[in-house]
């Protein structure tokens, strides 16, 4: 049962040659060469497994080798292997001794990789409770930070009190920085070298690069005392030399006092940007930063004016290497710059610092809690040429591909990571890589070595009798011949080593470049695409032309580079059918009589003809209508000469056959309207000579002649009726008008009013007239008195 399951496993591994690119390509003559072709390939070391000189057949997929008869025990198919060397369980709860804390599992393993095969490992990380914390406070002491210095004079006590709630083992240290003490970053007059603030006037310390002032200690009062004694300094340009200070604080492990089993926090406090990389070339400093500790006996950075500022890449390497987590506490104006830095530096966070550093305590506590809520893996070591991919399984339990970071974790939660490793090719060297959580001292060490050799290579029969009386060494089922011999069993000597007999013509490659010349005969290579054959391996069954991506259009067989078409197909690609069925139009005529059938498609020859069967042709004559003159002549009863009808039919390209006995397999049914409005029907067929013959001429549905008397009577009656109707209408209109006038008169008469006492026509007999010259007596008197 176990053997059957193992066989099934190999069958699953053995994929199709055409899909994977093939194994038996004829180029693998040894087991090791076979394994290098691809992870799908295996080697059969069984003796006498292949035909004479068919060494390439030993290299194939496991399934194909089993099918060829190779026993399972002789199949060389190494797979990737994982050996866990150290796997201590993760720590749970508080640990009395920090050296006993285990935060990653496993701790070391050996990985053997078959090139092209992936191997997945599971790594678990759990942050332990009450983990020791080392905090180094790195402060910018340029003149603009004077008020901040006064604010943090009691920071040590307050910070220790707050951190005691999170860990019982807390230490803190202090360092400061300003700028490289060299022009153009500082003024160089003697007065300003001694006191950079002399122009204010105010006393401040000479410009310095970095000073390590207080090693890490649990004495908070000592921290407060050191801070109270600090003095500010000054420089010219706005960017400071903070990255110099970060580098020294990270790499000077002994001087700073970083512990191996603790969380290393570096709090960087500044209100300005920092120089980095080649900025120091402004001062003529061109020696790159070496990333080493250069603190002198006074704990000052001694190479400040000699080495360049570190680059971002150098900072990342040293911070990760020394497990230092960086907390940028910067003012609002600088937050955007340092957020960009933090995106590049693993484990770095950014907090907004108030103008006087009044919120520094809360900023540090918040940053610490944020760092403890995240678990991120970092890869170190020799990873060149190694393919690594990560899948994170955080507290939700849902796998997240291409992610090596878990956020919103609680202390004590376990974060799992599936790490998939693969080698693209076989490199004859082992490599050492490290997977570690950012900021933690724990790490997983992995020794990666390639698995490119076969177990059968360990058993070698030197000068074996299996190789023609000792003419070679027997290994992995084949003979490795001594110089001057060749062949499957080293049976060919120097006299048969000539390849001229294996060449099709002088100057041509041996066996056409597709086979091996063994003892004067070609043994063709095996190909995943088909068979190679011929005395010179000059033929194959897969190099013919393709039609629509298919060899010989899938309608023929390829023989020595030429398509041999199956029945019903022709053409160079076997893409041309000999059937004319697709070319027959609905009327049963090939290409509607307007084209030729080529490869099952109509090629229209008549101008204007189109369509799959040339059925559309606006400019072509109607085959039915073109026979009109012939048909009408045949049906005419006016005594036209029969010879004249024959001539008209000849002009129309047709003859009339009155016999009813004709083939009705294919015909065209026509219908025309004649001059006398009759419907004429007839059939068109083609005789053996291809000429048109007219059959079954019928005339039907002829209209009857008109009845003239009835038409005249109807017209007369219609005229009479119209006259009567018009008279009636006139009479109605006149009557309506008269009635309207009478009504109007009656209305006016009813409105008239006459006086009843006097006849308006009567005149009296007496008339009275007035003399206009007569004046009354009194009026004359008045007029006279007025004049006087």
Swiss-Prot record:
Annotated positions binding Ca(2+) 2: 179, 235, 237, 239-240
Glycosylation site positions: 48, 97, 260, 387, 418, 463, 471, 541, 575
Signal peptide: 1-21
PROSITE patterns the UniProt entry points to: EGF_1, EGF_2, I_EGF_1, I_EGF_2
SMART domains: INB (SM00187), Integrin_b_cyt (SM01241), Integrin_B_tail (SM01242), PSI (SM00423)
UniProt GO cellular component terms: cell surface; external side of plasma membrane; focal adhesion; integrin alphav-beta6 complex
Domain PSI: 22-71
Description of how the protein assembles with itself and partners: Heterodimer of an alpha and a beta subunit. Interacts with FLNB. Interacts with HAX1. ITGAV:ITGB6 interacts with FBN1. ITGAV:ITGB6 interacts with TGFB1.
Protein's name in the database: Integrin beta-6
Lineage: Eukaryota, Metazoa, Chordata, Craniata, Vertebrata
């Amino acid at each position: 049962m176990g053997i059957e399951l193992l066989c099934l496993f190999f069958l699953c591994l053995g994929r199709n040659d055409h899909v994977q690119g093939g194994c038996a390509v004829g180029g693998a003559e040894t087991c090791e060469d076979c394994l290098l072709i691809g992870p799908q390939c295996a080697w059969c070391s069984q003796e006498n497994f292949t035909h004479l000189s068919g060494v390439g057949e030993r290299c194939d997929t496991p399934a194909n080798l089993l099918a060829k008869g190779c026993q399972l025990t002789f199949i060389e198919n190494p797979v990737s292997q994982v050996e866990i060397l150290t796997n201590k369980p993760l720590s749970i709860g508080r640990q009395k001794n920090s050296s006993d804390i285990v935060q990653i599992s496993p701790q070391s393993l050996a990985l053997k990789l078959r090139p092209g095969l992936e191997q997945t490992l599971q790594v678990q990380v759990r942050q332990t409770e009450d983990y020791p914390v080392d905090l180094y406070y790195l402060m910018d002491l340029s003149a603009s930070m004077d008020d901040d210095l006064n604010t943090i004079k009691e920071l040590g006590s307050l910070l220790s009190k707050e951190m005691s709630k999170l860990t019982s083992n807390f230490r803190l240290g202090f360092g400061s920085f300003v700028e490289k003490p060299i022009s153009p970053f500082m003024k160089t007059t003697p007065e300003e070298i001694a006191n950079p603030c002399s122009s204010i006037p105010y006393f401040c310390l000479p410009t310095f690069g970095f000073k390590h002032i207080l090693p890490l200690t649990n004495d908070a009062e000592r921290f407060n005392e050191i801070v109270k004694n600090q003095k500010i300094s000054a420089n010219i340009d706005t960017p400071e030399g903070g990255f110099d200070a970060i580098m020294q604080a990270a790499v000077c492990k002994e001087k700073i006092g970083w512990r191996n089993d603790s969380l290393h926090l570096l709090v960087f406090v500044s209100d300005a940007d920092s120089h980095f990389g080649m900025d120091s070339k402004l001062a003529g400093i061109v020696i790159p930063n070496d990333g080493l500790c250069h603190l002198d006996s006074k704990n000052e950075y001694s190479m400040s004016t000699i080495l360049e500022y570190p680059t971002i890449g150098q900072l990342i390497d040293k911070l990760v290497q020394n497990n230092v987590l960086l907390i940028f506490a910067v003012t609002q104006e600088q937050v955007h710059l340092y957020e960009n830095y933090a995106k590049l530096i693993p484990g770095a966070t950014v907090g907004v610092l108030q103008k006087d550093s009044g919120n520094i305590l809360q900023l540090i506590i918040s940053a610490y809690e944020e760092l403890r809520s995240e678990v991120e893996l970092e890869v170190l070591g020799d990873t060149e040429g190694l393919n690594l991919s990560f899948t994170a399984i955080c507290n939700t339990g849902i796998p997240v591909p291409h992610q090596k970071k878990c956020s919103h974790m609680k202390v004590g939660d376990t974060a799992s990571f599936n790490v998939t490793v693969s080698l693209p090719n076989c490199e004859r060297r082992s490599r050492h890589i490290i997977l570690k959580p950012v900021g933690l001292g724990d790490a997983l060490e992995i020794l990666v070595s390639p698995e490119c050799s076969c177990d059968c290579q360990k058993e070698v029969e030197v000068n074996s009798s299996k190789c023609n009386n000792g003419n070679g060494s027997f290994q992995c089922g084949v003979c490795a011949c001594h110089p001057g011999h060749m062949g499957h069993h080293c049976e060919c000597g120097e006299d048969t080593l000539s390849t001229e007999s294996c060449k099709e013509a002088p100057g041509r490659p041996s066996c056409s470049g597709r086979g091996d010349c063994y003892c004067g005969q070609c043994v063709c290579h095996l190909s995943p695409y088909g068979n190679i054959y011929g005395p010179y391996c000059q033929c194959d069954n897969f190099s013919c032309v393709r039609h629509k991506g298919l060899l010989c259009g899938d309608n023929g067989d390829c023989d020595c580079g030429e398509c041999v078409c199956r029945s019903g197909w022709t053409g160079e690609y076997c893409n041309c059918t000999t059937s004319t069925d697709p070319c027959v139009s609905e009327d049963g005529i090939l290409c509607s009589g307007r084209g030729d059938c080529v490869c099952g498609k109509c090629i229209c020859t008549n101008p204007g003809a189109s369509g799959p069967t040339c059925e559309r042709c606006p400019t072509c004559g109607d085959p039915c209508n073109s026979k009109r003159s012939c048909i009408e002549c045949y049906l005419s009863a006016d005594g036209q000469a029969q010879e004249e009808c024959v001539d008209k039919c000849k002009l129309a390209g047709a003859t009339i056959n009155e016999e009813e006995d004709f083939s009705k397999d294919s015909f065209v049914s026509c219908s025309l309207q004649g001059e006398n409005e009759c419907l004429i029907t007839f059939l068109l067929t083609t005789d053996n000579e291809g000429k048109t013959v007219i059959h079954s001429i019928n005339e039907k549905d002829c209209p009857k002649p008109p009845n003239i008397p009835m038409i005249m009577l109807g017209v007369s009656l219609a005229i009479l009726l119209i006259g009567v109707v018009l008279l009636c209408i006139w009479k109605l209109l006149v009557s309506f008008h008269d009635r309207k006038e009478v009504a109007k008169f009656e209305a006016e008469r009813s409105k008239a009013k006459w006086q009843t006492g006097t006849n308006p026509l009567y005149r009296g007999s007496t008339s009275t007239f007035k003399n206009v010259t007569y004046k009354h007596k009194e009026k004359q008197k008045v007029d006279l008195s007025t004049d006087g």
